């Protein structure tokens, strides 16, 4: 009965939305993005992420004990005995420039973030310490428990994409930053547990600066699509200096965490750089417009809605979780028919024109540390 009531409330809300509605990032009806599993967005910053992936597996966003992001403690807390990563066990990064040939590097608006991907064999990598003596139970996060004199080997972590969040997802001693970049790496060698792929993420924070634009961000920010589910090929000869986006001071905090978006899978090794890079006010505003809120109008004719007696302006993804309405017990069949009709009428994203009208955001709230090991690496 409660579910039926929720459907009726949603129906009333949707019906009350006349020719123009405001949609948060990830819910725009003109989106060309395709998704598997249950739909999600950042409207509640992850507090409502309960659902399943495309294979029917439940997300662990609300049940996991090692979730990301976190509030990184003060330096003096991490400088205590046993809370440092020894120099010989610290992660090393090597990122040559990304170079576009006109179609090999793409800036993507996927409805959740602005993401950069490439289609060629990029030579960049990070190397992560692991125990020299291993067994099938060893994991990518074992470096957190290694002692300074432990015999070690290294695995190679290959970057597969990077993307942004605003505001920052990680906090440094409670401080929030305007932007955070995540470089996602995949590890497939040496560790038995990683044959299917293990992941490590490097987080880079950005702080506002009164100076000019950060030229390292410009090749990306100058090519950000604003329509969800679309991408831009960087022009031929365009270079992204990924290595220079890493701070010159490579101090970092590392811990075991998760993806910061559904399904929120755990077992990732996180590195959060403690020295922020800079971003101008103008660049921050441009990013927030790229993930901004949209006012959308239907371009369909009134006749298409004549049978309903009023105009509809809906988003099919808003109704994604009601795909099986025939299973909903109801005192009346009207909610079923109403929502089925809405879904049928809103399958065409080109039936809408959308304009950005407000800054947006795409961050997840900080999660409880739950007693996890968090270590500081002082880069020397």
Swiss-Prot record:
Binding site for substrate: 260-261
Entry's EC annotation: 4.2.1.1
Cofactor field: Zn(2+)
Subcellular compartments: Periplasm
Active-site residues from the entry: 112
Amino-acid biosynthesis as UniProt keyword: no
Name of the molecule in the record: Carbonic anhydrase 2
Organism this protein belongs to: Chlamydomonas reinhardtii (Chlamydomonas smithii)
């Amino acid at each position: 009965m409660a579910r039926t009531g929720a459907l009726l409330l949603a129906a009333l809300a949707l019906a009350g939305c006349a020719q123009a509605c405001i949609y948060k990032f990830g819910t725009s009806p003109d989106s060309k993005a395709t998704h598997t599993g249950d739909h999600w967005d950042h409207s509640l910053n992850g507090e409502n992420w309960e659902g399943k992936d495309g294979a029917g597996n439940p997300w662990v966003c609300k049940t996991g004990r090692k979730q990301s992001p976190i509030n990184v403690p003060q330096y003096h807390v991490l400088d205590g005995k046993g809370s440092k990563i020894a120099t010989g066990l610290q992660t090393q990064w090597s990122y040559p420039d990304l170079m576009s040939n006109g179609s090999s590097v793409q800036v993507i608006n996927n409805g959740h973030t602005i993401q950069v991907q490439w289609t060629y064999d990029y030579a960049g990598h990070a190397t992560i310490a692991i125990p020299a003596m291993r067994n099938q139970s060893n994991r990518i996060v074992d470096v957190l428990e290694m002692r300074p004199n432990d015999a070690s080997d290294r695995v190679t972590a290959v970057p597969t994409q990077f993307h942004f969040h605003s505001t920052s997802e990680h906090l440094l001693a409670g401080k929030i930053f305007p932007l955070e970049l995540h470089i996602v790496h995949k590890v497939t060698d040496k560790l038995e547990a990683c044959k299917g792929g293990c992941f490590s993420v490097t987080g880079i924070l950005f702080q506002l600066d009164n100076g000019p634009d950060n030229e390292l961000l410009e090749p990306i920010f100058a090519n950000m699509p604003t329509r969800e589910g679309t991408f831009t090929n960087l022009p031929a000869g365009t270079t992204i200096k990924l290595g220079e986006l890493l701070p010159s001071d490579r101090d970092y905090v590392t811990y075991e965490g998760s993806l910061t978006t559904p399904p929120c899978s755990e077992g990732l090794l996180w590195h959060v750089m403690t020295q922020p890079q800079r971003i101008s006010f103008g660049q921050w505003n441009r990013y927030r417009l790229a993930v901004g809120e949209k006012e959308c109008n239907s371009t369909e004719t009134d006749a298409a809605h004549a049978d309903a007696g009023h105009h509809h302006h809906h988003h099919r993804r808003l109704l994604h979780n009601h795909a099986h309405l025939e299973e909903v017990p109801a005192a009346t069949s009207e909610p079923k028919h109403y929502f089925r009709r809405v879904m049928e009428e809103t399958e065409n994203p080109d039936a809408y024109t959308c304009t950005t009208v407000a800054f947006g955001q795409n961050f997840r709230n900080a999660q409880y540390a739950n007693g996890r090991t968090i270590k500081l690496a002082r880069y020397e």
